Amino acid sequence: MCASLNEVKKNDTYGVSQKGYNDNFSESEGVLHGSKSMPTSMKNMLQSPTMVNMCDILQNKEAANDEKPVIPTTDTATAGTGTEDISSTQSEETDQNSHLIASEILEGTFKDVSYKEYANFLGNDNNNQVLTEFVKLLSPLPSSLLETLFNLSKSIYFIAEAQNIDRILECLSIEWIACHPNTHWKSGYKSCHIVLFSLLILNSDLHNNFQVDHKKIKFSMVAFINNTLRALREENEYEELKIYSREHLIIEELSEYYKTLNETPLPLCTESRTSINISDNQSSLKRFSTLGSREFSTSNLRSVNSNSTTLYSRDGQVSVREMSAKSNKNFHNNHPMDALYLKESFDDGLITENGSSWFMDDLILISKKSLPRKYSKRDKDQVAAPKMTSKRNKSFFGWLKPSKTTTLIEHTSRRTSLSYLNKDSEWERVKIQVKEGRIFIFKIKPDVKDIIQSSETDSATIDYFKDISSSYFAYSLLEAEAHVVQDNIIIGSGAMKSNVCNKNTKRKSGNFTVSFPENINGPKLVLEFQTRSVEEAHKFMDCINFWAGRISPVPLTQFEAVSNAEYGWSDKILTEHASLNLKNIVVSEWKPLLGLELLYEDAKDVEMVELKERLKELMNFTRQLGIWIDKHNEIKDKLVEIWSFDDNYFEAVMNNWNSRYLYMNNQYKKRLSYLKALQKAMGSVQF
């Protein structure tokens, strides 16, 4: 038996009810994946960032809430007499009872619940002691995390609600660290928890027949490794315990796990305790933790999709996005706003055409969690709030760190675009206008019932909506990007009630997100919205991406500028490395250049070009960027060969290679979104 689990208090709580969904894929994005595939010779390092958030969970759409069985909990003995002896005796009896129940679950003889509900029973927050005893019975645990997961899957029917699975994996991680304290994971049970969760998702992805747009799309090895690594880097202990110093070992470990799991799926335990192949139970697998998309979207792990982002931003202090920036101040003070685009003759007839790529206006819903805190409680007459500052988490992906009161999944749903998966999500009415390079948001007061439906843009209409709003603000769409998150959303908290949509409508609601890149004023921001229909969500997406693409300059400087810094792949290194003393080389950290969009929210100083010219720029840029990505891929094997002599150099160079690849690939996909939106808009223009 390994060290006791009782030393770690488990007080996580959940409120997540998640449903399956299908993300949309453009034809061009599919081309990207095919043309940027992993070289067959690559075995250990990362290449493709085309993966999704580990906590996007697919569950059976047919499993209604009222059909879920009630999971009993174990009684907790209390000292009714208040005497120490009685309390001690009852505590011992409770421990014995928990051990007995755990043993019966392991043997498959526990009759209080169906064997298919064992995992839900163990993951119930009131049954922590039984869960602890059950995990102890699995000891000694194998030295491999994947083999440990195999043993768990053979011991229990491991299909359950996501939060219950998460609790079980956390408990298993604690026990594994107790059994194996001298590995490169050190005492980092949270990191092991992330790996176990990622492996479970990978298993479902590889062996579930879930399809996207009628095409079976599976994670590649590099997507799995990349997703897992970026989640690990966000966990505080990953840096505090210096686990990252052995990251090359972790990469090798994850690659072996992928190859093993790709060939041999996790077993599915049956009532008779004989295991069957998980791929034979596709209907049940829909409730497994799986992934709804293969895209690196706004609901993903934080992406590297702006000129301001670098993969390893581990230090420094930054401010929260300054909401009282120039456009917002002008909006609140009724001052004219600077033009963000070069106005052309055809614009006059389109900028007020609601439902077009030029203009969208409607009353919809916004996730309360995504509302800027500075404005969530502000009075409408407050013009400018004091600047807020906060320390950035030293590790890059802090959203994945479980807090003391929440576990991985619920924590993630608060920080990413997962509110539609949470039955307890709160949504508020907003009037949204997207026009001329900006998005205007009016948060309607709760007590306002009858709202005048008007899409006019005159000052009187704007003043009316300001009067009935508790807050209102504006964003420039420079470098922003919109995505429709799913086509079939089930949401709690009375989403889309009568004040927003017709009760008799049978159309399914749609959801879209708008992401604003990390800039000099603060971190990446994601706003989540719900519309009356999926069609309307797509219209908002097209309009936002049209304006973002029209006003955002093509970042050619990022790729054409020549730096004197050595990142590990200079021409001299690639051609003369055999004659160089590589240990004397100073390898710098690769970072994108500071782009102009980081300095100006209203970017009036950015060169404005005609729509046709911007479209031409985007077409040429995406074509050229594809070539640069291919060239960057081609040097990867050479870098492995050159820098393998030293772990520290190898890690630094490969981190640089991966950072640049992620940046290029995300720029590629963002510009493709812009290109698609501009091409669609051009179809309605007569030159």
UniProtKB/Swiss-Prot annotation:
Please name the GO terms that the record assigns under molecular function.
guanyl-nucleotide exchange factor activity
Q: Where is the PH domain?
A: 412-551
Compositionally biased tracts (Low complexity): 73-83
Answer yes or no on keyword Nucleotide-binding. Answer: no
Q: Where in the cell is it found?
A: Cytoplasm; Cell membrane; Bud neck; Bud tip
Disulfide bond entries? none
Similarity-based family: Belongs to the YEL1 family.
State the protein's name.
Answer: Guanine-nucleotide exchange factor YEL1
In its UniProt entry, the species of origin is given as Saccharomyces cerevisiae (strain ATCC 204508 / S288c) (Baker's yeast)
